[in-house]
Amino acid sequence: MTLLIIYAVLSIIISFICSILEAVLLSVTPTFIRVKKKEKKAYVTHLEHMKKDVDKPLIAILTLNTVAHTVGAILVGSEAEHVFGNGGNGVFIVSAIMTVLILVVSEIIPKTIGATYWKKLGSFTAIGLKLMIFPLRYTGILWILTQVTKLIGKSAHVSTMSREEFIALTDAAEQEGVFDDNETGYDLSF
């Protein structure tokens, strides 16, 4: 029973970290990166490179997350069969519990945390992703998977702000009181 719990907890912890990293990476904005560069935060250079080439960190996250889920399911299922036997409902119950835990504890909760606290988790994410990418880069796995994504995506991750988005952003900032009275009323119909 101890091994079953260890396998389940390890699988969920690894997936939890992957989900936080993914949510933070996808939530970080170019403006945030510029602000942190002006503040001379050391981690922001890594974060900026990852945002510019988002396929590589996403490949690392999804690879580790898939391995955690797959190996975790195999080990937990095997150990559940060893503990509860082949004929009873024990394996089914363990599988159902594991499915709910993976969904809630390693997907929904960490992605909510990452999307909510992404500004505070920027440094953690930059370091975590750098460590996660390292083994994939030096085994060649990252290169192979990057080539696959290039066949499908072809630079689909370009981040630019359109005129409409800029106007909507300034309108929202004005409505939320970000600007002083003397800073509003500019004609943006250029």
Task: Enumerate the language-model features and the residues they cover.
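Membrane-embedded alpha-helical segments of inner-membrane proteins
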Residues: 1-179
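Long, charged amphipathic helices and adjacent flexible linkers at domain junctions
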Residues: 182-190
